[in-house]
């Protein structure tokens, strides 16, 4: 979480953490956002250990992408509230769900693309890209139950339990996988150093 691959990676992570973190903290309080962020870091690292453990892991991308996923979760659960009169007033447009999703895509697609580019074009220094996906998925799954909702509807209560159970199941599966793959004979594709 404290080591990064180059200045671009460090600066991008800091900017996204500040922008998205502050926006989420204003509505949901710092401790809820902290929970999402830390679970995103852990979830990203677990995803990396399951899928791509032979590659170096650096940066806070799991946490950053969990904040992006948490914003998506907020947009999903508050869609009706955000879309109310969104075309009538420019201020409403900038707070609408459509604008937020487009803005998030403009932030994360170039960063994720650069990570894939670095992974493919620099095989001598491979870098993990699964923490991005793991953090994003964890951000959505934990964002729905942890972050506050403005107006709770019946489908959102169902979504709450589904996302919470999916989050718990993914964490348990990843931990069990890591525990069972301690011995090289169980996981022959993983490089073990002496």
Regions found by a protein language model. Give the residues of each.
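Transmembrane helix-loop-helix
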Residues: 1-71, 78
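Beta-strand segments within the central parallel beta-sheet cores of soluble alpha/beta enzyme folds
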Residues: 35-38, 84-88
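A sequence-composition feature that detects small, non-aromatic residues
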Residues: 45-47, 56-60, 70-73, 91, ...
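Interfacial segments of multi-pass membrane proteins
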Residues: 70-77, 142-146
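Non-transmembrane, extramembrane segments of multi-pass ion/lipid transporters
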Residues: 80-82
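C-terminal transmembrane module of polytopic alpha-helical membrane proteins
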Residues: 85-194
């Amino acid at each position: 979480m404290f080591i990064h691959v180059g200045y671009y990676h460090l600066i991008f992570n800091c900017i996204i953490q500040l922008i998205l973190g502050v926006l989420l903290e204003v509505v949901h309080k710092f401790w809820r956002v902290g929970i999402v962020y830390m679970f995103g870091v852990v979830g990203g690292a677990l995803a990396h250990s399951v899928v791509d453990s032979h590659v170096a892991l650096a940066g806070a991308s799991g946490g950053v992408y969990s904040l992006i996923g948490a914003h998506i979760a907020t947009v999903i659960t508050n869609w009706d509230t955000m879309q109310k009169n969104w075309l009538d007033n420019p201020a409403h447009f900038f707070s609408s769900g459509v604008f937020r999703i487009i803005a998030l895509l403009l932030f994360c697609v170039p960063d994720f693309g650069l990570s894939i580019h670095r992974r493919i074009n620099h095989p001598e220094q491979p870098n993990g890209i699964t923490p991005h996906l793991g953090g994003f998925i964890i951000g959505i799954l934990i964002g729905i139950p942890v972050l506050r909702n403005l107006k709770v509807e019946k489908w959102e209560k169902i979504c709450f339990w589904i996302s919470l159970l999916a989050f718990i199941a993914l964490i348990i599966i990843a931990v069990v996988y890591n525990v069972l793959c301690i011995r090289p004979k169980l996981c022959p594709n993983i490089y073990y150093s002496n």
